[in-house]
């Protein structure tokens, strides 16, 4: 498997610059907010979302030369993503993410809420200054989608008749919406044909769904240390993901366990056993592969380039995280 560092080589310099710029962009006059923001962007990671924005920007520009507006869009994408994580961690009562303390565990819930709101507000300001109404419409809808996803997740906890379609819709709102919108936005800033821009929206959509589905598999198959957060955390809170939905199709014994919210001894352990013994993980892996393959097909209209190849490799890398 190619390392993510090698895959992102075409935008390595741009990502280095982005990392330096992020702390400057979210600087606040208030020392606590500044400290919280710096804490957020000090976390290590390859920042796949802005990397994809930068790769699409290069793949859609002549000679792969991108503009300052493309770079700013990549920064906005990461700021919005980070803001959503701050609020997610509060709602999930998570103390760690990527192996480091969350903002609310270090600074308290009030500061964390304000920090998340502040990041959303900052992203809106920088978004408006891109001076592209179409891009503003695309990206601003993402913030609405985040809220929609959280509402749906809250309303559907321990819902044993949740459909796969409902699960995928929630996954789109919470994960894939930002990737889809920012992918298309990068193309629009390159002034490409609308057909190509829509293809790239669908690339981001299906890649985002594949990424979320893989994450939901890893929640069952990886350790807390590997995940950087507690394993099986979604199931414990009643958030039924694809592995559980497929297991429910094959074994109805799961229904009473989930309906009583794992309140009796061994309920949770028996649920994990059923998920493992059915073909639920295998079927979920196939679902992720389907979305990844569609994502790759959406790149067909792009001209040959190293950035296009990197976009394909990212899609394959998402699946290879399972092995």
UniProtKB/Swiss-Prot annotation:
Keywords: Cyanelle, Isoprene biosynthesis, Magnesium, Metal-binding, Photosynthesis, Plastid, Transferase. Isopentenyl diphosphate binds at residues 46, 49, 81, 98. Its EC number is 2.5.1.-. Mg(2+) 1 binds at residues 88, 92. One of its GO terms (cellular component) is cyanelle. It is an enzyme of class 2 (transferase). GO terms for biological process: isoprenoid biosynthetic process; photosynthesis; quinone biosynthetic process. Mg(2+) 2 binds at residues 88, 92. InterPro entries: Isoprenoid_synthase_dom_sf (IPR008949), Polyprenyl_synt (IPR000092), Polyprenyl_synt_CS (IPR033749). Transmembrane segments: none annotated. GO terms for molecular function: metal ion binding; prenyltransferase activity. It is found in: Plastid, Cyanelle. SUPFAM superfamilies: Terpenoid synthases. Binds 2 Mg(2+) ions per subunit. Belongs to the FPP/GGPP synthase family. Possible role in synthesis of the nonaprenyl side chain of plastoquinone or in synthesis of other prenyl chains such as undekaprenyl pyrophosphate. PANTHER family: ALL TRANS-POLYPRENYL-DIPHOSPHATE SYNTHASE PDSS1 (PTHR12001:SF69), GERANYLGERANYL PYROPHOSPHATE SYNTHASE (PTHR12001). This is Prenyl transferase. It comes from Cyanophora paradoxa. The lineage of its organism: Eukaryota, Glaucocystophyceae, Cyanophoraceae, Cyanophora.
